[in-house]
A protein has these predicted regions:
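Beta-rich ligand-recognition domains in immune and ubiquitin systems
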Residues: 1-253
Length: 253
């Protein structure tokens, strides 16, 4: 049997009793998962990003069970994913490392040139950032796997997005879901946008990652695995940044 204990990054106190019980800390009650009957030298399990895990082993055979091993600490890093080139609109150019989206200046297209990222598991907190290069109109957000590829991001009940569109005097950030919208106007155009998909807290947040400021927060009980989604409406490029630890401004949001 191999118990697996999870610990939050901000977990501050712990105590083990009889090898199977862990007390509640000031912040979070840790939980255990056990895997019995492991017959191969390896076992694959899904772990949440930005979490500390304690692994314990105990051997079992017809003659009895061994003592539980000492804890092995494994700390996971931030969510990492790539763009799915097969989902890209023909007008978009996707880099060989599947992290850069480009819409050429003279590209001719109909509809909304979009592309999806790899599917994120429906648990934990996922954070990524987008660096904007000379693109004045774009959409970034998430959509459930069941979302129709022909639909427009943010105009149905299975997608949520931030739509950046310039005006004569400012930049308008429009937050869309099922076609309903909320507008935020800013005088500067952030070149780095952060997105936090928080399944645990039921939130989707968009940040000005340069200044560490929340642009918009959506409260919703997200239930399904989701694709990060991107659409360019004007020429330019978006670069995807993943695998990072949660910035302090995200932890405190």
């Amino acid at each position: 049997m191999a118990p697996l204990g999870r610990q939050s990054q901000n977990f501050v106190d712990e105590q083990f009793v009889n090898d199977e019980f862990i007390t509640r800390s000031l912040w979070l009650l840790c939980d255990f998962r056990s895997f019995a009957g492991i017959k191969r030298p390896e076992l694959k399990v899904s772990l949440e990003p930005n979490v500390n895990y304690f692994f314990y082993l105990r051997a079992a055979n017809p003659f009895g069970t061994s003592e539980q091993s000492e804890a092995a600490l494994i700390s996971t890093k931030g969510t990492r994913f790539h763009l799915l080139s097969k989902t890209a609109h023909p007008a978009l150019q996707i880099s060989s490392n599947a992290t850069v989206i480009c819409l050429p200046e003279k590209a001719k297209f109909t509809g909304f040139p979009s592309v999806l990222g790899e599917l994120l598991p429906a648990r934990g907190r996922h954070y990524w950032e987008i660096v904007v290069y000379a693109c004045r109109s774009y959409r970034i957000g998430i959509c459930y796997e069941a979302t129709s590829r022909s639909s427009v991001l943010g105009l149905n009940d299975t997608s949520w997005c931030m739509h950046c569109c310039p005006t004569q005097t400012s930049f308008l950030y429009r937050f869309l879901h099922t076609g309903m919208m909320s507008d935020v106007r800013v005088t500067e155009h952030p070149s780095r946008i952060g997105i936090l998909l928080d399944y645990s807290g039921g939130r989707l947040l968009f940040f000005n990652a340069e200044r560490g400021l929340v642009l918009f927060s959506i409260r919703h009980k997200f239930t399904d695995a989701a694709h990060p989604a991107f659409a360019l409406e004007k020429a330019g490029a978006l670069t995807l940044c993943t695998g990072m630890e949660l910035p302090e401004f995200v932890k405190h949001s």
